[in-house]
Amino acid sequence: MPVLLDSSRAPRLDALLSKGNTQGLECQIDSPTGDLPLIAGIGTLASAGAQEIAFLSNPRYQSQVASTAAAAVIVTLDVAQALRAQGSTLVFVVCRHPYLLYARLAQWFDAERRGLPPAGVHPSAVVAPDAVIEEGASVGPQCVVDSGARIGRGASLGPGCIVGQGSTVGANSRLHARVTLYDGVHVGARAIIHSGAVLGADGFGFAPDPTLGKGAWGKIPQLGGVTVGNDVEIGANTTIDRGAIENTIIGDGVKLDNLIMIAHNVRIGAHTAVAACVGIAGSTVIGERCIVGGAAMFSGHLSICDDVTISGGTPVTSSITKPGRYTGVYPYSEHGEWQRNAAVIQQLALLRRRVRALEKA
C-alpha cells in the first residue's frame, strides 16, 4: 500500500495506537531501543517501507518478518517472543488479534486520507421544501432528496444519489455516488452504501390473471419498504427489493458484497456476511452471524438458523435448522470427464434400485 500521509501528518507509533481505536485489543509496544517510529501508512510484510506498519496474522508468512522493511509489525505475543529469541530488533506491536488491529488502524488512516465531505447542500442538488437535512450532513452534486425525507447528522450523499419520499438516512452514514433509495427506505446509522446500489425497487410480485389473456400476469403492488440497520455495508450494484406488505429487513452489522440480489420480504439477521453474486429469493429468512459464500443461491420461503456457513456456489433449496457449514457444489473437472460423470449421475436412481435388488438376492 502506498504511504497514506505525508511526514508532517504522520503520528508516532504510540499516538497512532491512541488514535486508532484499540479498545479491547490489549496492545503493547515492544521496542528494543525504546525509539518509536513515525507511521505514515500500512503495508504488507513484503511491501511496507520505513514509515509503514505491517501485520502478521497468518503463520505461513512468518518467514517474511525477518526481511521486512516495515517500521513496526503487529504480532501476537508468542510470535514476538520467538522472533526476539532469534535476534530480531524490529519494533513490535503485541496484540492478541493482529488482523483486527490492522483493520482498526486502516479505518483511521482511511478517514485521515479521505477527510469529511463539506457539510451543506450543493447548489445543483434538488431538496424538497419539507425534507430535513440535519446538522453536519452533506448532500452532493445532482442529488435529489424527496418530500418528507431526512438526512441524519453527519451523513453524506455522493454525487447523483436519490433519496425517495419519506426515506431516511441515519447519522454518519455514507452513500457513495449514484445510490438510489426508493420511497419508504430507512437506513440506520453509520451505514456505507456503495455506488449503483438500489434499495426499495418493487419486489417480483405478480398474480396469474386470465382476464388479461392466457398465461397473463397481473402486477401486485409492493406496499412495504426496506429497513436497514446500523453499521451495515452494502456493496456496489447490490439490489434490495421492497416488501410486498411488510418491510424487507437487513439487520444491524450485516455486510453485503457487490452484485447481490435480495428479493421482497427477505430478512437477514444481525452480523451476517454475504459475498458477491448471491441471490436470495422472496420471504427467505437468514439468521444471525451467518456467512454466505459467493454465488450461493437461496430458494424462496426458507428459514436458515443462526450461525450457518454456506459454501460458495451452493444452491440452498430447503430450510436449515442446525448450525454448521453446508456445501452443495459439484466439483469441477476436465469437460470430457464431467460429461461422463454427468451421464452416470442421471442413472443414479436406476443404479440404486439395482444395488438394492442385488443386496436382497
Curated annotation (Swiss-Prot):
Report the domain of life of the source organism: Bacteria
Pathway it works in? Bacterial outer membrane biogenesis; LPS lipid A biosynthesis
Q: Which GO terms describe its biological process?
A: lipid A biosynthetic process
Catalytic center residues: H264 (proton acceptor)
Q: Which Gene3D superfamilies match?
A: Hexapeptide repeat proteins, MurE/MurF, N-terminal domain
Q: Which reaction does it catalyse?
A: a UDP-3-O-[(3R)-3-hydroxyacyl]-alpha-D-glucosamine + a (3R)-hydroxyacyl-[ACP] = a UDP-2-N,3-O-bis[(3R)-3-hydroxyacyl]-alpha-D-glucosamine + holo-[ACP] + H(+)
Keyword entries, A-Z:
Acyltransferase, Lipid A biosynthesis, Lipid biosynthesis, Lipid metabolism, Repeat, Transferase
Which terms does the record give in the GO molecular function aspect?
Answer: N-acyltransferase activity
Annotated Gene Ontology cellular components are: membrane
Q: Name one Pfam family in it.
A: Hexapep
Q: What is its EC number?
A: 2.3.1.191
Q: What does this protein do?
A: Catalyzes the N-acylation of UDP-3-O-acylglucosamine using 3-hydroxyacyl-ACP as the acyl donor. Is involved in the biosynthesis of lipid A, a phosphorylated glycolipid that anchors the lipopolysaccharide to the outer membrane of the cell.
The UniProt similarity line reads: Belongs to the transferase hexapeptide repeat family. LpxD subfamily.
Quaternary structure, per UniProt, is: Homotrimer.
The protein here is known as UDP-3-O-acylglucosamine N-acyltransferase
Q: Report the source organism.
A: Bordetella avium (strain 197N)
Q: Which gene encodes it?
A: lpxD
